[in-house]
């Protein structure tokens, strides 16, 4: 009989957020796979949990995932926990989940705290559509590519950042996105929880005199529809109307449809485009 992998969300700060279901599961599984056993032992001791632990982290994720899947195939039940929050969100848990799926090992999630969602709900920014970026990569080329993608992102963006990198990241976001609203959250659910709604420019000014402390969740406003529309219009206006027509005709549009789309792009009537083209023909 196959074992089950339990993804157990743990508190991101306030121990009162630990659910009874997670406590019971951690007490009854055969093994707990933890991102940092030294950190997790404090949590387990607090809840009188004495289940054996093993480490599962970024630097052993592939080798250890194979080992854990082997134990699951032999019928052991395993709980996966991260240092704080929900496993597989910005941590190596996804590798283990994927391997379990490949071997048809049951996986279930015990939902609970997640810093990204907690910050989003506190941000005051749009929650209708959002994207999670986690930590920006250290590699400069990779980071540049992601920031380039985010320039046109219309959804609310959620990022994580360490205090010693915060100012640099704010500078990079400001350079890429321009002035945007941002909410900076730190110490979430703890005694000194801070939620700071501001703008990128004002945040940079603020942290020139205030030292960043604690882990941050950054919630950044996406590009507004009006801003995107103005950029599109500027882009189309850099083309001649003939070039604009050719662009759509090369994509397979007939002349009438292309004319209609060109008029829409430029915010003018179709008749105006028609008269221009025939006046210049």
Stretches found by the model and what they are:
Residues 2, 156, 163-281:
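A contiguous loop/helix-start segment that scaffolds small-molecule binding in enzyme catalytic cores
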Residues 3-5, 75-79, 155-156:
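Loop/turn-to-beta-strand initiation segments
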Residues 12-13, 83-87, 163-165, 223-225:
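Short glycine-rich anion-binding loops that position phosphate/pyrophosphate groups of nucleotides
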Residues 26-32, 104-108, 156-157:
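Short active-site oxyanion
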Residues 95-153:
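Class I SAM-dependent methyltransferase SAM-binding "motif I" and its flanking Rossmann-like core
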């Amino acid at each position: 009989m196959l074992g089950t992998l339990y993804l157990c969300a743990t508190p991101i700060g306030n121990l009162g957020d630990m659910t009874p279901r997670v406590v019971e599961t951690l007490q009854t599984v055969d093994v707990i796979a933890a991102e940092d056993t030294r950190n997790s032992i404090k949590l387990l001791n607090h809840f009188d949990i004495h289940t054996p632990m093993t480490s599962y982290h970024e630097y052993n994720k592939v080798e250890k995932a194979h080992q854990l899947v082997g134990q699951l195939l032999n019928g052991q039940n395993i709980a996966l926990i991260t240092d704080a929050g929900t496993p597989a969100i910005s941590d190596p848990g996804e590798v283990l989940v994927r391997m379990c799926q490949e071997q048809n090992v049951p996986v279930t999630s015990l939902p609970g705290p997640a810093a990204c969602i907690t910050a989003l709900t506190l941000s005051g920014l749009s929650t209708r559509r959002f994207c999670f970026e986690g930590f920006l990569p250290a590699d400069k080329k990779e980071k540049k590519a992601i920031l380039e993608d985010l320039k046109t992102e219309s959804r609310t963006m959620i990022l994580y950042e360490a205090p010693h990198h915060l100012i640099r990241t704010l500078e990079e976001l400001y350079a890429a996105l321009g002035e945007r609203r941002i909410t900076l959250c730190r110490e979430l659910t703890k005694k000194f929880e801070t939620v700071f709604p501001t703008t990128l420019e004002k945040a940079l000014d603020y942290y020139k005199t205030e030292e960043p402390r604690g882990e941050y969740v950054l919630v950044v406003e996406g590009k507004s529809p009006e801003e995107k529309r103005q950029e599109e219009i500027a882009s189309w206006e850099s083309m001649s109307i003939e070039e604009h027509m050719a662009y759509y005709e090369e994509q397979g549009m007939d002349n009438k449809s292309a004319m209609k789309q060109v008029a829409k792009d430029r915010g003018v009537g179709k008749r105006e485009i028609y008269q221009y083209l025939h006046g210049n023909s």
